[in-house]
UniProtKB/Swiss-Prot annotation:
Gene: b3gnt5-a
InterPro entries given in the database record: Glyco_trans_31 (IPR002659)
Transmembrane portions of the chain: 13-30
Organism name: Xenopus laevis
Protein name in UniProt: Lactosylceramide 1,3-N-acetyl-beta-D-glucosaminyltransferase A
Pathway connected to this protein: Protein modification; protein glycosylation
Protein keywords: Glycoprotein, Glycosyltransferase, Golgi apparatus, Membrane, Signal-anchor, Transferase, Transmembrane, Transmembrane helix
Family, per entry: Belongs to the glycosyltransferase 31 family.
Superkingdom as given in the UniProt entry: Eukaryota
Location of the protein in the cell: Golgi apparatus membrane
Reactions catalysed according to its record: a beta-D-Gal-(1->4)-beta-D-Glc-(1<->1)-Cer(d18:1(4E)) + UDP-N-acetyl-alpha-D-glucosamine = a beta-D-GlcNAc-(1->3)-beta-D-Gal-(1->4)-beta-D-Glc-(1<->1)-Cer(d18:1(4E)) + UDP + H(+); a neolactoside nLc4Cer(d18:1(4E)) + UDP-N-acetyl-alpha-D-glucosamine = a neolactoside IV(3)-beta-GlcNAc-nLc4Cer(d18:1(4E)) + UDP + H(+)
Short name of any one Pfam family annotated for the protein: Galactosyl_T
Gene Ontology CC terms, in alphabetical order: Golgi membrane
EC number in record: 2.4.1.206
C-alpha cells in the first residue's frame, strides 16, 4: 500500500504539472497578439495559398481619390541632378530634417560621389529625401537651416508633408515619384535609412557586374510570410481595419534595398492606384511590387536590424550594415583599406576568412545581421 501511495502521489504531481503546462500554453494561445500564432498563420497562408490578389483589389482606389505624393508641394528640389548624365546608381537616403550630422557623415564617407567616381569609375548620385518639420515652434528655424544646407550641397529633396514615422509611405512615394520625373535614366535606385552604412565600393562593383539591361531586379533583406503586428504598444502596430489579412506579401527591409529602374517605374505605377494609408513603407512597397508581379531577391550581405561585426573578412563582402551613428568614419576607413582585399586573397586567405565568418555569423544566439549562410558565400 505504501508503494501504491507513492506512485499515486507521483502520478498526481505529474498530472498537476501537465495541467499547469497546458493551461499556461492555452493562456498564451488565446492572446490576440501572440507572436507564435501570428507567424503560424502567416506562414501557413504564405506557403499554402500564396495569393495576394484580393489584397491588391481591396487596397485599390480610383485615381481621383488618391492622396498620393503628387498632392504635396516641393519645398526643396534639385531637378537637374541627373540631367544629361549616365547614372549607375541613384541613392536615396531617408532622413529627418534635424539629422544634419548624419547627412554630413554620409557625405564624407560612403556617400562621397567624387571619391566613388575617381576610385571606382562609377557615377553615383546621393540625395536625401525628407518631409517638413512638424513642430510649428521649430519649423521656421529648421527649414531655414535646410535651405542653407541645400544651397551648399544641392542634394536635398523635400516635400511639405510632416516628417513622421506614420508618413514613411509618403516618403517612399516621394522617392519613386522623383525618379520617375527627374531621373528615369538611372540604371539602379537604392533606398536607405540615414543610420545605414553602405559599402558603396562593393555595391558598385556588384552592380557593374550585372548585365547591361538588367530588369525585374530587387535585392535586399527579404521578409517572407511576415505577419502584421497587432500589439498596440509596438511601433509597427497595424490595426485589423487597416490590414485585416494574416500575412504580408514578400518585401525587403526598408533599411536598405536596391531596384532596377524598370522596377522603380512599376512600383510607382502601382502606387498610383493603391491606398497609401498603410504607413509601413517597406510593406507598402511589397504590396505595390506584388501587384506588378515582382519578386524580391535575398542578398545575404544586406543586414537586418543588427550591426555587422567589425572584421576585415566581413568588410570584403558586406553591402549594408544597420545602426551606425557615430562610427561611420571609422567603419569607412576600415572598409576601404587596401589591406582588406589582401587578407582574404589566395587559398589560405580564403580559408582563414571562411573560418572567421563562421565564428562571427553562425552563432546559437542569432543576431539580426547576416545569416550563417553568408559565411559560405
Amino acid at each position: 500500500m505504501l508503494i501504491s501511495a507513492r506512485r499515486l502521489r507521483r502520478c498526481q504531481f505529474l498530472q498537476l504539472l501537465a495541467s499547469c503546462f497546458v493551461l499556461s500554453l492555452m493562456a498564451l494561445l488565446v492572446q490576440e497578439d501572440n507572436s507564435l500564432i501570428s507567424h503560424v498563420k502567416s506562414y501557413s497562408y504564405r506557403y499554402l495559398i500564396n495569393s495576394y490578389d484580393f489584397v491588391n483589389v481591396s487596397l485599390s482606389i480610383p485615381r481621383d481619390r488618391l492622396d498620393g505624393a503628387a498632392s504635396y508641394r516641393y519645398l526643396l528640389n534639385n531637378r537637374h541632378i541627373c540631367l544629361n548624365e549616365d547614372v549607375l546608381l541613384l541613392l536615396f537616403v531617408k532622413t529627418a530634417p534635424e539629422n544634419r550630422r548624419r547627412r554630413d557623415a554620409i557625405r564624407n564617407t560612403w556617400g562621397n560621389e567624387d571619391f566613388i567616381r575617381s576610385q571606382y569609375d562609377a557615377n553615383i548620385k546621393v540625395v536625401f529625401a525628407l518631409g517638413a518639420e512638424g513642430d510649428p515652434v521649430k519649423s521656421r528655424e529648421i527649414q531655414q537651416d535646410l535651405v542653407n544646407e541645400n544651397k551648399r550641397f544641392k542634394d536635398l529633396i523635400q516635400q511639405d508633408f510632416s516628417d513622421t514615422f506614420h508618413n514613411l509611405t509618403l516618403k517612399l512615394l516621394l522617392q519613386f515619384g522623383w525618379v520617375n520625373s527627374f531621373c528615369p535614366s538611372a540604371k539602379f535606385i537604392m533606398s536607405a535609412d540615414d543610420d545605414i552604412f553602405v559599402h558603396t565600393p562593393n555595391l558598385v562593383s556588384y552592380l557593374k557586374s550585372l548585365p547591361i539591361e538588367t530588369q525585374d531586379f530587387w535585392i535586399g533583406r527579404v521578409h517572407r510570410g511576415s505577419p502584421p503586428i497587432r500589439r498596440k504598444t509596438s511601433k509597427y502596430y497595424v490595426p485589423y481595419e487597416m490590414y485585416p489579412w494574416s500575412s504580408y506579401p514578400d518585401y525587403t527591409a526598408g533599411a536598405a534595398y536596391v531596384v532596377s529602374r524598370d522596377v522603380a517605374a512599376k512600383v510607382y505605377e502601382a502606387s498610383q492606384t493603391l491606398n497609401t494609408s498603410l504607413y509601413i513603407d517597406d510593406v507598402f512597397m511589397g504590396i505595390c511590387a506584388n501587384k506588378m508581379g515582382l519578386v524580391p531577391q535575398y542578398h545575404v550581405f544586406f543586414s537586418g536590424e543588427g550591426k555587422s561585426p567589425y572584421h576585415p573578412c566581413i568588410y570584403n563582402k558586406m553591402m549594408t550594415s544597420h545602426g551606425h551613428l557615430d562610427d561611420l568614419d571609422y567603419l569607412w576607413r576600415q572598409a576601404i583599406d587596401p589591406n582588406v582585399k589582401s587578407i582574404s586573397s589566395g587559398f589560405w586567405g580564403n580559408l582563414y576568412c571562411r573560418f572567421v565568418n563562421i565564428m562571427l555569423l553562425c552563432r546559437i544566439s542569432y543576431v539580426d545581421t547576416y545569416p550563417c549562410s553568408a559565411a559560405w558565400s
